[in-house]
Amino acid sequence: MALQESTPSLQNLLDSIPNLVDHLYDNRKGSVLKDAVLRQPTQFVAPEFTNWREEQMACRTSIAFYDQSFHMTTTFIRGKDAVALMNHLTVNSYTTFGVDRSRHSVVCSPDGYVIGDGILYCLAPDELCLVGRQAGHNWVRFNAKSGGFDVEIEEDEFMADNPNGRRNFYRFQVEGPHAPALMEQLTGAPMPQVPKLHLMHVTIAGRSVTAMQHTMAGNPGWELFGPWDAGPAVKEAVLAAGEAYDMKRVGSVAYFTTAMELGWVSRPMPAIFTHPEMKAFREWLPETAPEATWALGGSYNAPKVEDYYFTPWELGYGNVIKLDKGEFVGRDALAASQGNDHRQKVSLVWNPEDVAKIIEGYMGHDQLPTRYLEFPRSNYATWLYDGVHDGNGNHIGVSIYPTFLWTERSMCTIGVLDSAHAAMGSEVTLVWGEPSSRKSKYLEPHRQIEIRATVAPAPIGKR
């Protein structure tokens, strides 16, 4: 993603526009399905193998099979300073990190706001593998190349953007109440009980497979990965064995709803646009990078991009912040704000009568319609932030990732709310639809509507 000499940088873009929020609102938005099939191309993952409702349910009733080989960005970091680089950039501690361990790594800006997160694997001495969304990868790659660390990186882009037409690793996930029995059948023995985020090695279809106990939706599950060329044989064996357990392959439509099920904010606004110490990064990053071309949307209409940033505490990552590990990017800001009254991440369950009013609102021609509600996922912008207020109209937080969960028979969102309004069972109101002051050529003209919602746990399956 490094800047080519003839390409303007993100900093050039920021210097040329009057307001970044307005610019991001004007970026292309609208098609949820288009985004899903871009990240999981249809020649590899069907939008639906059966139907998205049964595919959502499988993780709770039988087994869900997720093919994760195509949509995530991967960065390999090799060299004697590999761990030192990540220790410098992330909030995590690495004192017990080593081969066959992994971390949920979180990278923050110097002022303590989240840039991105991902899973960091230690594959061998001095060899790490970071897997996740693109924003955090660009920051890691920039620092690997410019920070004076003795490392080399290999960029393995998601499939639709990958010049090699293949990935280094296949990556599958099996999850559901029958997943332990399936894994025992595939490997010939019960899966060993190992601590969270520890890797183990098993044999499936005669191939060595790296496995990690991991959940996408709060149920028993394992991530399985290995060399790309071994993927078809392993996949065939898993699918064949899964037939006895009514395992369902999960298509791209249902797959991306798992973030709501898990309560994971998969695409926070990356906190890269404003801090002066990150100017060199913005000069390195091209204006064509996703951070500049993805779209902002929703009813939350704040004037500054900083208003869309999250702290790691707000996203539920407080347990991985290790302030006592020494210096790292963002440490001073996080230490200074540690005792603050942080907003809290929750689930918001929409009132079904109000959901019906949204749909009723675009039936007929007698008035300006409500904003179209797409099922099962309606985040029509990359960063979709809807405003949330209390019964007196006071702003109390944001609502993101609108998703219909067949597992809950409910329309839900992830909320990040002021702590005074985050108690389970609290009633709040969110606003669905863009403000009339913002006209997008990618969205139909529509009116806003208020939606009552009830605060529930995140992950929502805990309610």
Language model features by range: what are they?
Residues 71-78, 109, 119-121, 128-133, ...:
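Short secondary-structure transition/capping motifs
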